[in-house]
């Protein structure tokens, strides 16, 4: 825990490379999401549109492959207590928006076995990917969970830092879907 706090303090003191992205989102400038390629760790397509499934079935997924749909991009870890508390909300929302909104979980700083156990325990019905430090940096993450809402053009329309509420998730999805 001390190491995580020290890393957070260092990141804040040194300047976060993704701070510009976060500032643009907060200013409602709808910046383009960084196009990154992720390793798929949880290939569950229950709530994904059929035509997107091929994008992740080969074991990697480019974020740009999801264009054409609003995306809820949730950064989490198995050891994160607020992530644990919001997992059921995300699973239920993904089922309710099945085929219309793409949910993608991004596991951060975790062991893949721990991540898969977390996903199975919460019966997550959408694809999850693993990430590295560059992902955290490029998105300007300062803690977990963090959720970004992309419109169908891959532009970030909103974000939530910390545990989601049902109302915040619902309203942010509506904003992304209109964008």
Where do the language-model regions lie?
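Thiol/disulfide oxidoreductase modules built on the thioredoxin-like
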Residues: 117-124, 130-178
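Residue-level recognition of short loop/turn positions
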Residues: 42, 57-58, 153
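N-terminal targeting signals for export/organelle localization
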Residues: 1-53, 179
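Structural microenvironment flanking redox-active thiols in thiol-disulfide oxidoreductases
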Residues: 84-122, 130-138, 171
């Amino acid at each position: 825990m001390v190491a995580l706090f020290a890393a957070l303090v260092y990141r804040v003191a040194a300047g976060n490379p993704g701070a510009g992205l976060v500032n643009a989102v907060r200013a409602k400038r709808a910046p383009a999401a960084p196009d990154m390629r992720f390793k798929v760790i949880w290939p569950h397509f229950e709530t994904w549109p059929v035509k997107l499934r091929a994008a992740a079935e080969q074991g990697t997924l480019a974020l740009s492959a999801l264009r054409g749909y609003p995306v809820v991009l949730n950064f989490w870890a198995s050891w994160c207590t607020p992530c644990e508390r919001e997992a059921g909300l995300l699973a239920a929302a993904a089922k309710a928006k099945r085929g219309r909104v793409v949910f993608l979980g991004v596991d951060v700083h975790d062991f893949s076995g721990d991540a898969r156990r977390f996903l199975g325990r919460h019966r997550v019905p959408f694809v999850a990917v693993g990430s590295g430090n560059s992902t955290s940096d490029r998105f300007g993450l300062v803690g977990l969970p963090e959720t970004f809402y992309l419109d169908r053009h891959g532009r970030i329309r909103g974000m939530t830092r910390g545990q989601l509420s049902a109302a915040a998730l619902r309203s942010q999805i509506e904003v992304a879907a209109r964008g």
